[in-house]
Amino acid sequence: MTRDPRHYPDRPYLGVSVAVWRDGEVLLVRRGRAPLAGVWSFPGGGVGLGERLADAARREVREETGIEIAIVRQIDHAEIIVRDADGLVERHYVLIVFAANAISGEARAGDDAAETRWVGAQEFARLNLTEDTRRILAAGNPL
């Protein structure tokens, strides 16, 4: 079995996350795999070696949701550090967060997304969102 380099890493794991907007709603995915299985967040994932951040953002949204996007701008970043009971760094992520408009495609769950959903502001409080997703959504639509 291959070791997951994101578990007890020797350096932070770089990723992207994308707030995709369409008609006043944002696209969220319910994670299908640990460590966030069942939790809602923006689509996103890892940046490959030699891959530009914006290219990784477009690829991850396409893989997880089937939606093609036009990136508007970088809007935030998130630093996630999880320590185990002994204080060792179990996971360390640095996510660059983009805002984008949906330009084509029908939302469908793919890759590690268990479900996708277009969500209006009135629904945010009812969903089990990651802390950073909730914080970014609380700032409102950045477009």
Name the predicted role of every residue range.
Residues 68-77:
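A short coil-to-beta-strand element that immediately follows conserved catalytic motifs
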Residues 99, 108-139:
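NUDIX/MutT-family hydrolases
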Residues 25-63, 67:
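Conserved Nudix-box catalytic region and its N-terminal flanking loop in Nudix hydrolases
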Residues 1-17, 88:
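Acidic, metal-coordinating catalytic segment for phosphate/diphosphate chemistry
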Residues 18, 74, 98-100:
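A structural signal for short, well-ordered beta-strand segments
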Residues 20, 28, 100-102, 118:
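Conserved hydrophobic "DFG−1" position in protein kinase catalytic cores
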Residues 78-106:
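Active-site-adjacent beta-strand/loop module that shapes the phosphate/pyrophosphate-binding cleft
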